[in-house]
Amino acid sequence: MSLSLPPLIAVACLVVALARISWLPLRSWLRRRRRTHQLAAQLPGPRNLPLLGNFHMFFGLEPWQVPHLINQLAKKYDGTFKLKMGSNFSLMMFQPRDIEVVLGSSQLLDKAVEYSFLRGWLNDGLLLSGGRKWHRRRKIITPAFHFRILESYDEIFDRQTRLLIHKWQQTLGHSFDLGHDVHLFTLDVICETAMGVSTNAQTNADSDYVRAVKTISTVLHKRMFNIFYRFDLTYMLTPLAWAERRALNVLHKFTEKIIVQRREELLRGGVTQTTDGADVGAKSKMVFLDILLQSNIDDKPLTNLDIREEVDTFMFEGHDTTSSGITFFFYNIALYPECQRKCVEEIVSVLGKDTETPVTYDLLNNLNYMDLCIKETLRMYPSVPLLGRKVLQECEINGKIIPAGTNIGISPLFLGRSEDISSEPNTFKPERFDVVTSAEKLNPHAYIPFSAGPRNCIGQKFAMLEIKAIAANVLRHYEIEFVGNAEESPVLIAELILRTKDPLMFKLKKRVI
């Protein structure tokens, strides 16, 4: 039975309407893509291939070879160059005047696409959130790093450091991987300051939680450098993705259990009033979780999921980054014995000769030369070697028109090693940061180990105090010696957290003060 003419016309009209509806967004997308390619063509950079973009330049490279390639491109294109990775453009910007604009802009606050690999763990925590949510969360979290709160953490720093010192008595005279132990130390510290509990990582490195954290670190490393793992469609079919899901289940359940327990404890204790954070600084002996549990947004307390996001973010940002900074600090002062000697002299002058004297917030703030050594370490070996921003709307940066959708890459690592910015950039010279005696005027937008602008690292004071605490306690107990070729710089891997290709090995000797 054939259709009559009117139904045929109706079907034809429907097909035409659907085609028009489908064509309009497609046409809009094609226009945007054309505009993106027109603007990108005006930016300097190596030639890219159809479909692959510049992926071919990275084929066959080991992770530790990538920084060398980026450094070559930065020199060739005078510090600014584009890379096309598949269908996405990235613009690397290594000029301080460009960095000042990017990091100082209130319109360039969203993170680059590489950070999405963390979303399974951190969800919409402070590191990954954007827009209004980021502004609100930043406001309520900032008081958690008030100096009165930081003061209350010095007992945790001191106790966990002494556990590490006791553990290291077994290593005296033997070569060992110091960074591995420091990683477990920072994990214990961040768990206790974030949630009020200890994972006992230093005494039980094989716990489910510690192994889950290691798994996530492996996932991040492989997704950064393996093209097969970068795309969700292919990644989700791999055994690594299954391992990640198991690890996330462990991490999330651990945090959620602590949140529920702590909320019940606060309710039993009669602490129910929420705060917008204004009076948090007047409180003491509060861990990060307590502050979140007593905070609100729009007169509503944070949900358990809200709190989990921020606690997990604090955990991620506070243990791996600090561990990297501590390890490279010990590496530098082991290579430069005179700097180690000056640090010890200052420690004795501030803390005295009694090694049982606890390190406190006030005493740590008086370790000025050590502060210079830490800053110089972070110039040479920034814990976060690459910062990324996402351009949501077309913008102009010092005459360069940047298309929407571009990822902007900024490297504290390459800035710190630039001969155009620092004299003898590969030499450890703490005095360059002495504002009184140094003739070297450092550009504030060329030294950004904690980023800069409105989205700078909220926990930088916490990190500096933790590094000082472990450095002060360890150095008054042990002399530190690097085991390896001091003439050769360590081979670096610039992923989300700066690492070395091979572990840095050290020997300890009992110090006599």
UniProtKB/Swiss-Prot annotation:
> Which terms in the Gene Ontology molecular function aspect does this entry carry?
heme binding; iron ion binding; monooxygenase activity; oxidoreductase activity, acting on paired donors, with incorporation or reduction of molecular oxygen
Membrane topology, from the record: Peripheral membrane protein
Q: Which cofactor does it need?
A: heme
Q: Name one GO cellular component term.
A: endoplasmic reticulum membrane
Gene3D superfamilies (UniProt xref): Cytochrome P450
Q: Describe what upregulates or represses it.
A: By isoquinoline alkaloids and phenobarbital.
Q: Which Pfam families match?
A: p450
Q: Which cysteines are joined by disulfide bonds?
A: none
Q: Which residues are noted in the entry as heme-binding?
A: E317, C457
Q: Decide whether keyword Manganese is in the record.
A: no
Where is the protein situated, by its record's location annotation?
A: Endoplasmic reticulum membrane; Microsome membrane
Family indicated by similarity? Belongs to the cytochrome P450 family.
* Entries under PANTHER family matching the protein: CYTOCHROME P450 4D1-RELATED, CYTOCHROME P450 FAMILY 4
Tell me what this protein is called. Cytochrome P450 4d10
Q: Lineage, please?
A: Eukaryota, Metazoa, Ecdysozoa, Arthropoda, Hexapoda
